[in-house]
Regions:
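Conserved "HGTGT" condensation-loop signature of ketosynthase/thiolase-family condensing enzymes
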Residues: 1-180
């Protein structure tokens, strides 16, 4: 099953093709930034395809897992959108956008939604996916309680003229330690 990223990140109310993957609509969906919506859907799709979600579309509570993404741009799109709200003064600053001005927030949204308990963070790197996979392998080698880590790359480039955005990458993989 493949989704049109450009379509679902703009959906204020997810349609049935999305809810079949994400289950219950996250309470914060309406105020989520595009990167968070992408993370929730893409990570849910990956978990579903790997048969790692229970019937309630949550990760089995016995499984300890993690989420690590690499990014070249971090939360630049949201940072710029937030700064644009400051143009008319601090009283017009968007508290909703401010909450998404850290690059790990999309992962936190996905982790909360699917009840993922384990390391969850983002790394800024010129080789985002490679760096995330390297970090995932480090965790798996050093914490035997972790079943798997979803390593990914998530970057959205801003349109500086209009402060709009275009997805440039959204890739995720399940990384497991190979027991020889």
């Amino acid at each position: 099953m493949q989704f049109d990223i450009e379509k679902y990140w703009l959906q204020e109310i997810p349609d049935s093709s999305l809810t079949s993957v994400i289950g219950e609509i996250p309470k914060r969906w309406g105020r989520m930034d595009p990167a968070s919506r992408i993370a929730v859907v893409e990570i849910g799709l990956l978990l579903k395809q790997a048969n790692l979600l229970a019937k309630n579309n949550l990760l089995n509570k016995e499984i300890k897992a993690g989420l690590i993404t690499g990014s070249k741009l971090g939360s630049l799109v949201t940072d710029l959108a937030f700064s644009k709200t400051l143009e008319e003064g601090v009283d017009n600053a968007s508290p909703i956008l401010f909450g998404y001005t850290l690059p790990n927030i999309p992962l936190a949204e996905a982790a909360c939604h699917y009840k993922i308990i384990g390391p969850v963070y983002s790394i800024i790197s010129e080789k985002p996916l490679d760096c995330a996979i390297e970090e995932a392998n480090f965790w798996l080698k050093n914490d035997s309680g972790i079943s798997f880590i979803i390593a990914g790359e998530l970057d959205i480039t801003p349109d500086l003229e209009n402060i709009t955005h275009q997805v440039i990458s959204a890739k995720f993989k399940i990384i497991k330690l190979n027991h020889a």
